[in-house]
UniProtKB/Swiss-Prot annotation:
It comes from the Viruses. It comes from Invertebrate iridescent virus 3 (IIV-3). SUPFAM superfamilies: Cyclin-like. InterPro entries: Cyclin-like_sf (IPR036915). Belongs to the IIV-6 359L family. This is Uncharacterized protein 105R. The lineage of its organism: Viruses, Varidnaviria, Bamfordvirae, Nucleocytoviricota, Megaviricetes.
Amino acid sequence: MCDHHNIVLDEFGTSTCADCCVHFDKSFSREFTVNHNGPITDYYKSKSAIMNVLEKEFGVRDSNTIKIAEKIFNWTAKNKTVKGTNKRSILCASLYYAYYYTQTPKNFDDLLVQFNINKKCGSKGIRLCQTAIQEAMQESPVDFEKFKGKIYTFTSTHKEKLCDLIKKYNIPLNHYDAIERIIIEGHLKKNKILNDRINNLWISCIFYWILTINPLVDPEEFVSINTSYISLAQLKADLTYLKKNL
């Protein structure tokens, strides 16, 4: 019989025993059980609901990773109640970034399977977390000093689209890493959200890299391949910015 020693208070004000999954109503705030040695002991855990979910349901053991994931989740949720798929997508993305920041990166596709969400939902979580991280970074830059330059990372969806784009220009894929770094840095410098949607900055960053290999490439000819993504004026404006800031 379970003594309900491991009580978790969630964000909805309800409580659940993490060991036997017995759910208590909203009026329940603490669980007192009798210790085998006699005295009554308060077994209410100080861990938050998010921490317990990451540890119990998803097997995250590193306390630093859990703390960072919880912080990112709270920034993203903005103290609002999030449920269902939306909650899982944000939590998945929060954990993805937490692993990345603690230098123990995990494959995003594997996390999607673990959290039982598809790529569309996962991409939404990534986008929401990036926005929240960016806002938090601006409000408290000191907290992000050790993560400087690591606000963004390419998920598998990003990588697939960038690989296709690189092939379009007949660029060997062994140059992928260099181009990805420029795109990430470009978005950081311009304070733009990086998601898996190809935008003008992706194109401009690729052209910026091409110019490091061949400075004689004609911008107008390059733009003619990408009229749906970028104009000549935009390319020139982006290049001016990138040359000055990268």
